[in-house]
Amino acid sequence: MITFLALSLLAHAVDRDVAEHTRLSEEIEQLAQRQLWLGVEKKYVELEKLGVELSFDDLMHGAYAARALGNMQGAYHRLKQASKIKTTKDVIETMYAIDENYGLVELITVPPRGDVLSVAEIPFDPDQRTAVDAAVTYVKEKGVYKGLLPKGKYVFAGQPFTVEPGIGLKIEVSPHMKKTTGEIVKVATTPTWGSGADDGEKPPEPTPQKQ
């Protein structure tokens, strides 16, 4: 009897999650059609919290929302998940474009404090501009940033650096000893595949289309 009750409760919980998944997916679709990306992102986060298996469309809408909000690393991660379901030409080309034009950076102030991130030349591409703007705002508020930035020259907390695709860059700036020798700056670089491949694997090839 106890086992039957437990199974019944489990089935009810699963049905409830499935219904909630359907509801959120429909809302995401409607918001995406209107290009209300902040709303899409909020609903996508709710969807992730359900712990259900996301569909290809869920992941693609999530990727577009992350890109529109300047979170290129989030966009890449969601595209990569989508590619495991369906490796379309659009998905793979977008992943390669990110790998070829962005670099992975981690910027840290010790202790954390709001600081300044500036770029030498504002990117022409709107997605790249949005990514830069999002990073600048986050650094101003938090003094730290970890994610993808467009390739180019930047200055973080007075420390110049260059973002290059295929190179992971970590910069740690501390104000200690500022009165005597200036700020302590630690810079470390690590090779990556492209930039967005967080596990070192290159994007998959598109699935051949049937003739």
Positions of PLM-derived features:
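Acidic, Pro/Ser/Gly/Ala-rich intrinsically disordered segments
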Residues: 1-211
